């Protein structure tokens, strides 16, 4: 029984899919063919050339050469080998000359009944368990059958009779489940996280509080250009690296910050609850984000300076929640002075980035909206601010 490798991934006559264009000549040099492809003595190079020139159907088909890329293995039983089964002397003679090869295929068939097979899919090897019955009703393509048939009559009888001479030994044409392809999170990536918002909303104090745990009242002037710091957030034992950028909020620096949107992984958009203008400008900021940032960028809306007194507050908490729902982004109120929800905002970003950081996209196990809602702390002081 001869084992013949057939690439099933390529199309007929497609130079990029494993076979040459129609009309290309096969090599005449017999040494260019693998010795173990055809075993029968009657299958000579002249015989192969004769079969290649014999038309199939309307005569327009020109069988492609065996592709160099092997993606499937088909075990064939030739007509002559079927006759060996009925001719003990011939079978004995073949076995005498090639005992090791015959034993190899017997052992190979046993492996196909119980083995754990692998399916090669875009350079990713994924383990797949299959039963010995294979795939009921499956037939190889007519092109593959024609390529290795020993004559038109043999081919037609073989194909129409359920291709009894052909069977799959260890092939899985079904891709493995997506989680089998999923690669571990890459903890070496620096995830660019940008703080955005009008000048004076407290972005620098917010970052310093997260980075050092300190609040320095009145010690910062308006940020000029870009400043950054690096932090590592550990999420369920996995290190998520954040490269946090503090941007200038002034209009004259807006063209500078636009350039940083394009490769940003996450954006924290802040407004000042004591300054309604900064809240009103959020929609303009979101418009810029939609225009310049990546489509799947993580966005968190933040109402900062929530430690304010009731008389100072100009934006209700409910207004921030409504704006977040309107743009489908999570919302929370924070205080760089007291530390309220400052760490939570970066933790939410890190968890969302980890969830998305697998090779095949979101693992489907984390919802940033639920996480923020379940973990946002209610302000213990000045509660009347929320009920204005």
Curated annotation (Swiss-Prot):
Amino acid composition bias (Basic and acidic residues), ranges on this chain: 47-56
One of the GO biological process terms: Rab protein signal transduction
Post-translational modification Cysteine methyl ester, affected residues: 385
Name the UniProt record assigns to this protein: Ras-related protein Rab-26
Residues holding GTP: 197-204, 246-250, 304-307
Species of the source: Drosophila melanogaster
Single GO cellular component term: endosome
Pfam families assigned: Ras
Gene from which the chain derives: Rab26
Role according to the record: Participates in exocrine secretion.
Lipidation (S-geranylgeranyl cysteine): 385
Keywords linked to the UniProt accession: Cell membrane, GTP-binding, Lipoprotein, Membrane, Methylation, Nucleotide-binding, Palmitate, Prenylation, Protein transport, Transport
Membrane topology field: Lipid-anchor
């Amino acid at each position: 029984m001869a084992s013949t490798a057939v690439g099933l991934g390529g199309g007929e006559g497609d130079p990029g899919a494993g076979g040459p264009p129609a009309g290309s000549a096969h090599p005449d040099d017999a040494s260019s063919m693998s010795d173990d492809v055809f075993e029968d003595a009657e299958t000579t190079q002249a015989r192969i050339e004769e079969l290649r020139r014999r038309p199939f159907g309307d005569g327009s088909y020109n069988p492609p050469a065996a592709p160099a890329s092997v993606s499937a293995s088909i075990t064939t039983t030739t007509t002559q080998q079927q006759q060996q089964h009925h001719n003990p002397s011939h079978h004995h003679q073949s076995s005498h000359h090639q005992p090791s090869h015959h034993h190899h295929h017997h052992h190979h068939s046993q492996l196909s009944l119980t083995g754990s097979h692998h399916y090669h899919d875009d350079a990713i090897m994924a383990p797949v368990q299959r039963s010995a019955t294979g795939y009921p009703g499956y037939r190889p393509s007519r092109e593959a059958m024609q390529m290795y048939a020993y004559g038109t009559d043999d081919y037609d009888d073989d194909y129409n009779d359920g291709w009894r001479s052909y069977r799959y030994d260890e092939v899985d044409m079904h891709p493995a489940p997506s989680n089998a392809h999923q690669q571990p999170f890459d903890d070496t990536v620096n995830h660019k996280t940008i703080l955005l918002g009008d000048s004076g909303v407290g972005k620098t104090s917010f970052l310093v509080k997260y980075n050092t745990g300190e609040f320095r009242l009145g010690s910062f002037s308006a940020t000029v250009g870009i400043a950054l710091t690096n932090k590592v957030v550990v999420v369920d034992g996995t290190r998520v690296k954040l490269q946090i950028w503090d941007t200038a909020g002034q209009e004259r620096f807006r063209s500078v910050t636009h350039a940083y949107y394009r490769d940003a992984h996450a954006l924290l958009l802040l407004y000042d609850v004591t300054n309604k203008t900064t809240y009103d400008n959020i929609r303009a900021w979101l418009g810029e984000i939609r225009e310049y940032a990546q489509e799947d960028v993580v966005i968190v809306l933040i109402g900062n300076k929530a430690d304010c007194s009731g008389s100072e507050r100009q934006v209700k908490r409910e207004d921030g929640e409504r704006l977040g729902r309107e743009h489908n982004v999570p919302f929370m109120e924070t205080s760089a002075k007291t530390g309220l929800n400052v760490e939570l905002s970066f933790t939410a970003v890190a968890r969302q980035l980890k969830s998305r950081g697998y090779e095949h996209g979101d693992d489907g196990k984390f919802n940033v909206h639920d996480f923020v809602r379940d973990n946002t702390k209610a302000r213990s002081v000045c509660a009347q601010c929320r009920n204005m």
